[in-house]
Amino acid sequence: RSRMLTRLPNAGTSDHERELRTSWEENASAVSRDPKLIRQIFALLQEVEGAPADMEQPSAFNLAPARKALAVELPAPASDRLPRVRMVLAASGATECTLHGVPLNGPVMECLKGLNQVGARRRWEEDGRILCQGGEPVSGYNKSILDKVVHVGDDPFNLYLMLFQMVTRPARLKIIGESGLKFVDLAPIRHFLPLLGARLTSVVPGQEGLPARLESSAMLPSDVAVPAELPADALEALLVATAGWERDVTVDLSGHAEGRNIVSKVLPILQSAGIKASLTDTEDTLSLHVVPGKAQFSDELLPGINVVAAATLLAMPAFVGGSVKLSGRWEATGDARSGDAVKGLFSKLGVNLSVADGELSASFGEGIAEGEPLPSPNPVDDLTGLPSALLPLGLALSLIPAVRAKGGVMPKLPESVDKVLVESFLNQLGLSCEDGRLVSIEPSTTPWASPTVQWALALSLAAFLRPNIKLSNPGIVTNYLPVYWNIYNTLPT
């Protein structure tokens, strides 16, 4: 493709791109009958540039942490999701406030810039402050937004936050993002949005992800039933957006597997912002009733703790022994259900987790004489109760006995988990799942491309068990947690 384009006059024009795509689809259909796969491969090739044959190829990131007992003391990693949710709530009602201690990573900056594109007034300072300066509300029936192009970066949560904010106002806009969002599956969103008086269509025929066009009437219902296939991040963004609706709304979460996990995070945030919200949770019903309003925040808004990153650091002693201490309050995660899930998981494993005032600490294998082997944690045979964001961590921890014994029982996983992804993760550790049993195989030497930051963090823990695992996209972690690899490479202290 690259060679053809360089030989063509006016190289790169849309006509030539169309000719290439049409030719590709005609010829590729001879080897595959899956039109979706053919289009996805072509979209991937769009990202590839011709390179000289002698050009040095980038090497994968070698994961080889020190396998010694840990003695780590650090501040707890700050959350980037809670500040983004607060930025959106403040923008929804044009609330003036200052967020303190915010990690200025890629997703936070992309969210800030995206909100500014639709009328918010946000600016950031190098010390981690984000100043929400009022301006015009970005939600509401009287705030139409027409013929606008909005860039949302590379994070799906930012995309969903923006989508559901724009659904609250008459809108006709184009949403674009980085390459990672070209392949996000927006089909569940497209099927759901008509219930909210909106429509999302793909700009590229047959491509599921961005770029996409959103049209919204802002004619919002008073009752919404959430479908089971709606992504968990999209559900969270929807609940956040209800604060800016024009009428009271009841969101029925009964049919969604992650409903309780998500509402346990969002409800306290809405209530702390002065939004009237009440939960109905019975055996047959799970629903959230929200009375829209303008968010009001206290003066000192701290970012809270990133529960997945904190749990990853606290899990390290289970692999090599020692202790990890993080300064911070566990309640500051703003996610009580995930916090309880971490406590329950560590308790099953036999990892000592202490949540004292102002400090989180985890230890394992203390008291073992020098030279004695570290025992394996207790086996965990069921991971179905874990929130989806914690599943990769739970899997890595549960595999410790099987890796050391070169086999064992595969823990039970949620039905929705990507089984191909799980199998490729197992292969990196020299395991394969056959009829519910873990069997030993030759470890894969192919560099692993992680689909999410959570899976990349889990792989970094797996390297304690099998050093020199190769991660082809370490930037997926750096984008969210810029200092993680520095910490990782300086262990055991």
Language-model region placement:
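Short, structured segments at the rim of ligand-binding sites
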Residues: 1-493
